[in-house]
Amino acid sequence: MKKSDFHYDLPEELIAQAPLAERAASRLLVVPPSPQALADRRARDLPELLQPGDLLIFNDTRVIPARLFGQKASGGRVEILIERLLGERQARVQIGASKSPKAGSLIALDAGGQAEVLGRDGAFYLLRFEIPTPLEHWLLEAGRLPLPPYIRREPGVEDRERYQTVFAREVGAVAAPTAGLHFDEALLARLRERGVEFGHVTLHVGAGTFQPVRVDKLDQHVMHKEWLNVGAALVEQVRRTRARGGRVIAVGTTVVRSLESAWRTTDAAPEGELQPFAGETQIFILPGYRIRSVDAMVTNFHLPESTLMMMVSAFAGRERIFEAYHHAIAQRYRFFSYGDAMLLWSRAWGLGSGDS
């Protein structure tokens, strides 16, 4: 299987450059298994599309203002994108500079203080920050929000709120779990009234999410690592949902990545079952992989040839995904992080007559 198998042409004007005024006003393309028809809805319609007893699982990671700028001793400019916080004064980072900085060199930070280059960590660098407060708190004032590269503007004050889910609480991501951006407090309240239950995982979206696949043969691709936590309480919620015949719906590919990373086969469960797990994942989901943990997912529209296009193709079938994307382009849906979403059902799932 090749990267080019997941290419599609997208008019640039369909790449959303800013969020809508209302989160839940985003369009929602409902994609049931073929041959059922696609349906154009809104995110605010989700209570009508789900059933009492269903379980929505969100990623509760919180985006940090992870972009910094500075200057080397030589005078060369440096851009720093924090990949992961490592305690109060250290971080794993990407560095953009005309020449790679050497271990032991210092970077004077535009926001004040300096950072020492401790060395390389694979494609990343390890930095020690000489700053007055712990890095997590210092970044709130000194850092800039790392909007994705396809958003061709500088981040504004409103992005501090809108590039963050309303349920974000665990600090550590450098990119938002964007499917969650469509949920506001009013929509969450209506879903609760409908009898839909909520669960949470944590996956800290890393800077690797912005990196393109650089090889055409996908068996040569090295997936980036991300830290996640699937807790025992969530595992029990999923077990209860399954026992009562409810459906498990992931809000975003990061939730699917988390749940599939925590899926384990045992003698008692040869087909596998969800188990608590905290740690790094490097899972690469593409067609041929069977996603067992969820029945449906809410997900945004993804970049051509991206690993997320491959994941949703594994879930719903490549032909069905391309049918949905061609429909979305023809209907002028908004794409990527600040864009619209899909409610995507597994191709293994048959919708009952009570579903819309």
Swiss-Prot record:
Domain of life where this protein originates: Bacteria
Reactions performed catalytically: 7-aminomethyl-7-carbaguanosine(34) in tRNA + S-adenosyl-L-methionine = epoxyqueuosine(34) in tRNA + adenine + L-methionine + 2 H(+)
Pathway info: tRNA modification; tRNA-queuosine biosynthesis
Enzyme Commission code(s) on record: 2.4.99.17
Signal peptide: none
Keyword S-adenosyl-L-methionine belongs to the record: yes
Main location: cytoplasm
GO cellular component, one term: cytoplasm
The entry's keywords: Cytoplasm, Queuosine biosynthesis, S-adenosyl-L-methionine, Transferase
GO biological process: queuosine biosynthetic process; tRNA wobble guanine modification
GO MF term (any one): S-adenosylmethionine:tRNA ribosyltransferase-isomerase activity
Subcellular location: Cytoplasm
InterPro entries: QueA, QueA_dom1, QueA_dom2, QueA_sf
Keyword Transferase attributed: yes
Catalytic EC class: transferase
NCBIfam families listed in its UniProt record: PRK00147.1, queA
Quaternary data: Monomer.
Family: Belongs to the QueA family.
Role summary: Transfers and isomerizes the ribose moiety from AdoMet to the 7-aminomethyl group of 7-deazaguanine (preQ1-tRNA) to give epoxyqueuosine (oQ-tRNA).
Name the UniProt record assigns to this protein: S-adenosylmethionine:tRNA ribosyltransferase-isomerase
